């Protein structure tokens, strides 16, 4: 790991637990320079509320750190709030602040200031209440980086699950499983497992759409007409794709033992298993971006903000994964050079 590579951390919704997570994390030293892109005033006030003695070290374009902060301290690129934020109380006036932190982090990753960005949860509803159309981090960063197609992947120790479709009603899923979509998603998953995770020849298990993967066409024909022919074309490109497999048996130790990732057809086919296996220690990764972005797998938890009664496990895993991805990417760049 290059201990001089800087990483950006965005705390998300200022009334949620994101600022708390940043401060609690700062109690221990990180192996790299980690920069919170946040309001200094917000972090100072929340630290006082939590009873934490964290030294906030202001940094920015004029002076970036090139070594990790000591335990009990946190680098902060000050990004002012529009109005004061209070734990647990949403205010649409600060929607612009949230998006500014994401923009600074994303642009910093594009221009090389940061090796990766790690995001704490935002509150989509309050941003939309401010009159700003916002459907989530993923779509915002895709637009910021001019990326046409991105893929959502959640991961925990020992399991990665990517999705062909994401937040769709179940009744719309089958129509959305097209050969074109499946090809795009699989290619992105395969390419990023190689480029950002350092896996030379990824082994990907692919779920069927229907029960028993269609039971030879008796329980649905999508496997026969769309999924299998598409996988055959992709195998001809050199991809190691296993499936389509019945989802109820795919997620067993025997199948997963040598798998680098699972490709699920829809949200609730793959994510319940992952969250059962690693809830509180799982993360979200956006694949297909020209930058590295990882995130926690939970929400803003407004009721817990300022209480100190929160678990940093998901954020810690998101950080560790970002560090590993940056190291893999840096290693490939150096080899190419």
From Swiss-Prot:
Localization annotation: Cytoplasm
Family: Belongs to the PdxA family.
GO molecular function: 4-hydroxythreonine-4-phosphate dehydrogenase activity; cobalt ion binding; magnesium ion binding; NAD binding; zinc ion binding
First-tier enzyme category under EC: oxidoreductase
Species assigned in the record: Ectopseudomonas mendocina (strain ymp)
EC number: 1.1.1.262
A GO biological process held by the record: pyridoxal phosphate biosynthetic process
Remaining remarks: The active site is located at the dimer interface.
Keyword terms, alphabetized: Cobalt, Cytoplasm, Magnesium, Metal-binding, NAD, NADP, Oxidoreductase, Pyridoxine biosynthesis, Zinc
Lineage: Bacteria, Pseudomonadati, Pseudomonadota, Gammaproteobacteria, Pseudomonadales
Domain of life: Bacteria
Protein name from the UniProt record: 4-hydroxythreonine-4-phosphate dehydrogenase
GO cellular component terms, A-Z: cytoplasm
Catalytic activity: 4-(phosphooxy)-L-threonine + NAD(+) = 3-amino-2-oxopropyl phosphate + CO2 + NADH
